[in-house]
Amino acid sequence: MTIDWDSILSYNTIKVVRIRDRRLGILHLCFLIVIVLYVVVYSAIIKKGYVTTEEPVGSIRTSLLAPDELKSNQAYCKNNTEPYPYEKLDCVYYDEKLALFPIGDDVGFTASTRMRISDQTVNCSLMNPSCKFYTNTSMNVYLADIESFTVLIDHTMYAPSSQIQFNGDDLSGYVLDQNGNEIQLNESVNTIGVQGKPDILQLGKLLEFAGVDLDGPSLVNSSNSIRYDGCVLFVFIEYSNTFSYDLKKIKYVYSIKKVDDTAYDVPEVIILNNENSRLYYKRHAIRLIFIQTGVIGSFNFQSLLLTLVSGLGLLTVSTLIVDQLAIRFLPQRKSYSSLKFQTTESFRMKKKIVNDDGEDKLYHNIEAL
């Protein structure tokens, strides 16, 4: 039995056949229009398929400043005779240096709302493991008018791959209110997102954006106020330059979220005359944790190329669908199939062709198929 290697090792090539059938032509044209709209308009333009994105990193510096004049006789202070739904305490009028602790925190910020101050001494050697400090006197106080203190937020962002770097003063910015609207503040005290000005926000305004009322119920114990127990807030700073087609325009947006079911307190110890005498501060506070995030985009030719190549794949699929419809489902499928698929003569026959006359004869035979 002779093996026909020409049939076994046959090569399939592409043949272009123009089928004059309006049904197939309209279908293929519709596919083509949809693919062009998807690839060019949606993927490349609307979805910015020419852009590669990355998440920026950054740094935060904060500082606290007390107002020129603190409000006295607040409802939560003992010297105020008006009713208050929670426990009243004596009020102290501290400046920013005493209200802020810990100092130098590069990822967060803490402003005290209540402190329990204990005068403690020890009458034995601290080298003795059973030696303990004893509290002589204790005082529980509110820090009055902490809402009027202002916090300055100096932030910087950097995108490593595109090497885009800006300070917050150079950018336009916004803060989300409780309804999720982006607003820009340019008031006498509160300034957010104004180019050339630092971001400054009163703690009371910041709490308002988070939906927090210091004189509302505590997040862990409804019998206390948030002022009494403290709270934790996430302050997200989201950077973006993909909101428009101009990648040189960068904005940032603050969004402030409270952490449910949390209180906050931090201890502070001040040594007095010697290590046997100390002041112990248990501070309850507003704890702000800053998180810098976002999406920074830059032009990338490879991203654009991948977007366009995906369109070529869709064109191939659409052509395959129309071809299968033509050769398998239409009434003229046998005719269309015979036009699309054609088998040449064996290579043995071609070896007999030694001049142009033989090639012309083979060509006419193929045309007659």
Curated annotation (Swiss-Prot):
Q: Which Gene3D superfamilies match?
A: atp-gated p2x4 ion channel
Residue intervals on the Lumenal side: 47-369
Q: Membrane-spanning regions, if any?
A: 26-46
Q: What ranges does the Cytoplasmic topological domain annotation cover?
A: 1-25
Molecular function GO labels: ATP binding; ATP-gated ion channel activity; intracellularly ATP-gated calcium channel activity
Q: Where is the signal peptide?
A: none
- State the superkingdom: Eukaryota
Supply the alphabetized keyword list: Ion channel, Ion transport, Ligand-gated ion channel, Membrane, Receptor, Transmembrane, Transmembrane helix, Transport, Vacuole
Q: Which GO terms describe its cellular component?
A: contractile vacuolar membrane
When the coding gene is removed by deletion, what phenotypic consequences does the entry describe? Null cells are still capable of osmoregulation and do not show any noticeable differences in their sensitivity to hypotonic conditions. Quintuple p2xA/p2xB/p2XC/p2xd/p2xE null cells exhibit a slight delay in their osmoregulatory response, but are still capable of regulating their cell volume in water. Extracellular purinergic response to ATP persists in the quintuple null cells and p2xB null cells with no alteration in the kinetics of the response, but the magnitude of the response is lower.
| Function in brief | P2X receptors are ATP-gated ion channels that play a role in intracellular calcium signaling. Not required for the purinergic response to extracellular nucleotides. Not essential for osmoregulation. Inward currents are evoked by intracellular ATP and ATP analogs. Insensitive to the P2 receptor antagonists PPADS and suramin, and also copper ions. Inhibited by sodium ions. Permeable to chloride ions.
* Protein name according to UniProt: P2X receptor B
Record the organism.
Dictyostelium discoideum
Q: Output the lineage of the source organism.
A: Eukaryota, Amoebozoa, Evosea, Eumycetozoa, Dictyostelia
